[in-house]
Curated annotation (Swiss-Prot):
GO biological process: alkaloid metabolic process
Gene: asqH1
Binding site for substrate: R137, R274, K276, Y278, Y373
Reaction catalysed by this enzyme: quinolinone B + dimethylallyl diphosphate = peniprequinolone + diphosphate
Main enzyme class: transferase
Protein's UniProt name: Prenyltransferase asqH1
Binding site for L-tryptophan: E120
Matches recorded under InterPro entries: Aro_prenylTrfase_DMATS, DMATS-type_fun
Domain of life: Eukaryota
Pfam families assigned to the protein according to its UniProt record, in alphabetical order: Trp_DMAT
Higher taxonomy: Eukaryota, Fungi, Dikarya, Ascomycota, Pezizomycotina
Enzyme nomenclature, EC number: 2.5.1.-
Keyword vocabulary terms for this entry: Transferase
Length: 451
């Protein structure tokens, strides 16, 4: 399960981390003791020990999260609240640490990109037209001692337990959608799931904060029909939004290139929840992105220049993916050869070579909202280069207020390495055009760094 603070949940395809090397630096955090945030020192002094596994994850994660909260300007009291939640509600649900194996449960392979820590951070950038700071969220994969065993072959039990327990302190948490999609997406013969061969190209993690359908005998990713039938079975008002999306997928030239790989939802009352369908495409041209983000011309605006917004978004993709300046609008961004990946070419083509999108088919909407994900190709850019390109783009948009904080945060997360030597802190950068025309941008960051 992938859970985000703030009650929303989402997931994306994992990236290739086969060559990842993590350097934690001093105190396991990549920062000197005197640089430790005040809120972290307070929690660390006052909270009692909860065993070696808890101490292991707290030692790694808390300094990183505390740094991000500090650099985004969260008040100290809010930092204390979030770190206390981390201590009592997040850390206990990370993988048990076995002797000599701190990476994951010995029976379960994490879906999340980092092979070292089953979590991902996100930094949602501030908006120029709104008086607010960046938002920090933490995505985790929930584990239990029996994850991956015959009792819980798809690692679903810990997620349901966490949702149940959180409902006692967060009244808005609701398990209806989790139970519904769990019933629709999976068979219920644990013995047969254990007997099936492991499919390394298919995410084994299922009941996350998003779900990936997996029926017995299924090869590869589930077809769109699996998602559509499960959503329709809810009997809600999302029908017309879903119909619009399926019509686009069946009539647009880009539809055949979009492949579903997951569904995300908020664990709240179904009538209030977003329903986000995730797709990947190997197409990376401007024309392809434009077709998808406008839903074939169905999404437009009379209050701002949609074409200008789309070109601004694509300029960021070009910067981050190393696109030649003279690339034609109908030409994909060249995929440079990978020299040190151990993953197969098929896996790379499936999950990493192109763009990713989600479509929100929430009840009551006429058209789905669309978010666009740019993969960060760590084989060809270190994290200083990625951070510099991203902050340079923000400054060009007149949104440079937190750029220095962002680069300083990256330096502090680099685990004692020079940032130019790090690869792998960034995984994706997402963009979405808000209702007011503001381009909403989020950076997705991984714990540790790669030399």
């Amino acid at each position: 399960m992938l859970c985000k603070t703030g009650g929303c949940v989402e997931g994306r395809a994992a990236e290739d981390q086969s060559t990842r090397k993590v350097h934690w630096g001093q105190e396991g955090s990549g920062q000197s003791p005197e640089a430790r945030p005040r809120a972290l020192d307070m929690i660390s002094r006052l909270e009692p020990s909860r065993g070696p596994s808890h101490a292991h994850w707290w030692h790694i994660i808390s300094p990183q999260l505390a740094v991000m909260l500090e650099e985004t300007g969260y008040p100290v009291e809010k930092q204390l609240e979030i770190l206390t939640f981390l201590y009592h509600w997040v850390i206990p649900y990370l993988a048990p640490v076995a002797a000599g194996n701190a990476a994951s449960s010995c029976n379960w392979k994490s879906l999340l990109p980092s092979a070292i820590v089953p979590l991902e951070y996100s930094w949602k950038w501030d908006s120029s037209g709104k008086a607010r700071e960046p938002e920090i969220r933490l995505t985790i994969e929930v584990f239990g001692e029996l994850s991956g065993t015959q009792f819980d072959p798809l690692n679903q039990a810990p997620a349901m337990e966490l949702l149940y327990r959180l409902s006692s302190i967060l009244p808005g948490v609701n398990q209806i959608l989790a139970s519904h999609f769990r019933c629709k997406f999976f068979d219920h013969d644990n013995v047969k799931y254990m007997e099936e061969p492991r499919l390394d190209t298919l995410p084994r993690s299922t009941m996350l904060t998003y779900m990936t359908p997996r029926k017995l005998g299924q090869q590869g990713f589930a077809p769109l029909s699996e998602y559509v039938s499960a959503i329709q079975a809810l009997g809600q008002a999302s029908g017309r939004t879903l119909d619009t999306l399926t019509n686009f997928l069946s009539t647009s030239p880009e539809g055949v290139h979009l492949h579903p790989f997951g569904l995300a939802f908020d664990n709240v009352e179904p009538s209030s929840s977003r329903l986000k369908l995730y797709f990947f495409s190997n197409r990376t041209s401007y024309n392809s992105m434009r077709e998808v983000l406008t839903l074939g011309g169905r999404i437009y605006s009379e209050s701002y220049d949609m074409e200008e917004k789309l070109r601004t978004i694509y300029s960021l993709a070009q910067l981050l993916m190393g696109c030649p300046e003279n690339n034609a609008e109908d030409a994909d961004i060249p995929l440079l050869p990978i020299t040190h990946s151990q993953h197969t070419a098929a896996e790379r083509a499936t999950l990493l070579s192109g763009f990713q999108y989600y479509f929100d088919v929430a009840p009551g909407a006429d058209l789905p909202s669309v978010k666009f994900y740019i993969p960060v190709r760590k084989e060809h850019a270190n994290d200083r280069a990625v951070g510099s390109a991203l902050t340079g783009w923000f400054r060009e948009q007149g949104r440079g207020k937190f750029c220095d904080n962002y680069m300083r945060m990256l330096e502090r997360l680099a685990g004692g390495l020079e940032l130019g030597e790090c690869r792998g802190l960034h995984s994706f950068i997402s963009c979405m055009i808000g209702g007011d025309g503001e381009i909403e941008v989020t950076s997705y960051l991984l714990p540790g760094s790669e030399a």
